[in-house]
Amino acid sequence: MKVILRKDVAALGDAGEVVAVKNGYANNYLIPQGMAIRATEGTLKALETERKQQVKKVEMLRKTARELAAKIEQMTLKVFAKAGESGKLFGTVTSGDIADALKAQGIEIDRRKITLEAPVKTLGKYEADAKVFSDVAVKISFEVEAEGSEA
């Protein structure tokens, strides 16, 4: 019997794949557990339509991510932190601080997707990497300034 997997099954394949299994295995285990459905003409057409929609959705998200990356690359963020006379920070600038600075500019990126090469502990200009989409990465330029110099 041919079935369409609804969930990843270790011995058979990934969700969305059409696989041939024995009738008893399909009827007594896969289908009742919600792991698969029978592969009929209607379900195969529905699967194909769903795949096409998924591909379109991913392309739209990728296009939006590229536009966002281009916008981010052209800006230099200002991050304010408490600093001493010598320019040394009281603490460090983290990916969360950069995410907050981006949010102030109207751009939302999860702080976990922003990586710093080394801890930022002094005033100055730096770069961070951010993964905007699965295959779209961007360099974020930012400048660390002392709090109170915002004027």
UniProtKB/Swiss-Prot annotation:
InterPro entries: Ribosomal_bL9 (IPR000244), Ribosomal_bL9/RNase_H1_N (IPR009027), Ribosomal_bL9_bac/chp (IPR020594), Ribosomal_bL9_C (IPR020069), Ribosomal_bL9_C_sf (IPR036791), Ribosomal_bL9_N (IPR020070), Ribosomal_bL9_N_sf (IPR036935)
One GO cellular component, as annotated: ribonucleoprotein complex
GO molecular function term, any single one: structural constituent of ribosome
Keywords carried by this UniProt record: Ribonucleoprotein, Ribosomal protein, RNA-binding, rRNA-binding
Superkingdom classification of source: Bacteria
Gene Ontology BP annotations: translation
Pfam families: Ribosomal_L9_C, Ribosomal_L9_N
Membership in a protein family: Belongs to the bacterial ribosomal protein bL9 family.
Protein name: Large ribosomal subunit protein bL9
Source species: Chlorobium phaeobacteroides (strain DSM 266 / SMG 266 / 2430)
Lineage of source species: Bacteria, Pseudomonadati, Chlorobiota, Chlorobiia, Chlorobiales
